[in-house]
UniProtKB/Swiss-Prot annotation:
PANTHER family, sorted: REDOX-SENSING TRANSCRIPTIONAL REPRESSOR REX (PTHR35786), REDOX-SENSING TRANSCRIPTIONAL REPRESSOR REX 1 (PTHR35786:SF1)
InterPro entries on file: CoA-bd (IPR003781), NAD(P)-bd_dom_sf (IPR036291), Rex_DNA-bd_C_dom (IPR009718), Tscrpt_rep_Rex (IPR022876), WH-like_DNA-bd_sf (IPR036388), WH_DNA-bd_sf (IPR036390)
Protein's name according to its UniProt entry: Redox-sensing transcriptional repressor Rex
Organism: Petrotoga mobilis (strain DSM 10674 / SJ95)
One GO CC annotation: cytoplasm
Species lineage: Bacteria, Thermotogati, Thermotogota, Thermotogae, Petrotogales
């Protein structure tokens, strides 16, 4: 259902809509509207309608949206109607914190593997049933990976090398927390998360607002 013409900010907002709809569903609320979604997320109702229009018709004017139906359709658009197996690559403080984040399994992202290079960590247990393995084991894997997504939390000076190992091993997507731009080909999708860039964006907004 996705189109390459859909802007990335739209996809990110869809994930926000999905989370809000799940909250409504858990509260037993059957109907909502673009105005209600917009008010909850501090955006314009016209933006909500525009974002949804990329993927077809979802509601009727004056009637609104069926919460359950819209939630399921957005899940399908985002690919989160099924479980995604995830590996933590780099089991430092950040990697451990992410692995224990309760929202992951709630939204069908299941940690199934963990890799590091620190000999002191190898074979220790990250989560029940998930021992930490050495990254070199990925080089020796001849069979299909047991995960599709890698969360990369390694130092920037080794991030590209580790990403290359993951790509050659057959990973489909990398969520990269290293503060470096990774080079890749069309075999893998890379999403970068950079806290410093987000903080700089925040400081710009603060300066613009108060100076």
């Amino acid at each position: 259902m996705k189109s390459p013409k859909v802007p990335k900010p739209t996809i990110k907002r869809l994930a926000m809509y999905n989370r809000f709809l799940r909250e409504l569903r858990e509260e037993g609320i059957p109907k909502t509207s673009s105005h209600e979604i917009a008010e909850a997320l501090n955006i314009k109702a016209s933006q909500v309608r525009k974002d949804l229009s990329y993927f077809g018709e979802f509601g009727k004017r004056g009637v609104g949206y069926d919460v359950e139906n819209l939630c399921l359709k957005i899940h399908k658009i985002l690919g989160t109607e099924r479980v995604w197996n995830v590996a933590i690559i780099g089991v430092g403080n950040l990697g451990r914190a992410i692995s224990h984040y309760p929202e992951l399994e709630k939204y069908k992202f299941k940690i199934v593997a963990a890799y590091d290079v620190d000999k002191r960590k190898i074979n220790s247990i990250l989560l029940p049933g998930i021992p930490i393995k050495h990254i070199k084991e990925l080089k020796n894997k001849n069979d299909e990976l047991d995960f599709e997504i890698a969360i990369l939390t390694v130092p920037s000076n080794v991030a590209q090398e580790v990403a290359n190992i993951l790509i050659e091993a057959g990973v489909k997507g990398i969520l990269n927390f290293a503060p470096v731009t990774l080079n890749s080909d069309d075999r893998v999708v890379i999403e970068n998360v950079d806290f410093v860039i987000s903080l700089k964006t925040l400081t710009y907004e603060i300066v613009s607002k108060y100076d």
